[in-house]
Curated annotation (Swiss-Prot):
Keyword Repressor carried by entry: no
Keyword RNA-binding: yes
Function comment: This protein binds to 23S rRNA in the presence of protein L20.
Protein name (Swiss-Prot/TrEMBL): Large ribosomal subunit protein bL21
Cysteines engaged in disulfide bonds, as pairs: none
Gene Ontology biological process terms, A to Z: translation
GO cellular component: cytoplasm; ribonucleoprotein complex; ribosome
Annotated family: Belongs to the bacterial ribosomal protein bL21 family.
Pfam families named among the record's database cross-references: Ribosomal_L21p
Keywords per UniProt: Ribonucleoprotein, Ribosomal protein, RNA-binding, rRNA-binding
Subunit structure: Part of the 50S ribosomal subunit. Contacts protein L20.
Gene that this polypeptide is encoded by: rplU
Molecular-function annotations in GO: rRNA binding; structural constituent of ribosome
Organism: Acaryochloris marina (strain MBIC 11017)
Amino acid sequence: MTFAIIETGGKQLKVEPGRYYDVDRLADDPDTKLSLNQVLLVHDGNEATVGQPLVKGATVEVTVMQHRRDRKIIVYKMQPKKKTRKKRGHRQELTRLMVDAIHLDGKALGAASTKKTKKSKASDEAVAVEAEVVAD
């Protein structure tokens, strides 16, 4: 199992290829590809490379999927015996990133697999059969 620990937005995340993660809002448009070079650790299944503080030559290739907002957090402040109450809500702005690949010294350690599920294979076959029928 290939994974890396990266730092983004002042927080550290353990990321794996082919999975998506929500991080603090980035100023990039959806469907853009980014290369994150704040990599603290890379593990390729057999060997771990630990940076001091960063791993030299390590990058994580990601794609911005969408911008979204987290669920609402209620902030309630009250002073007892004073009839003073404040109720506020907060929704954190997030960016959803899909991890495409982890690179170490220019070599891809892990890349998102493009496996097709049984359902998508069946639908592809159905589309091919329809195309043959239409062509006839």
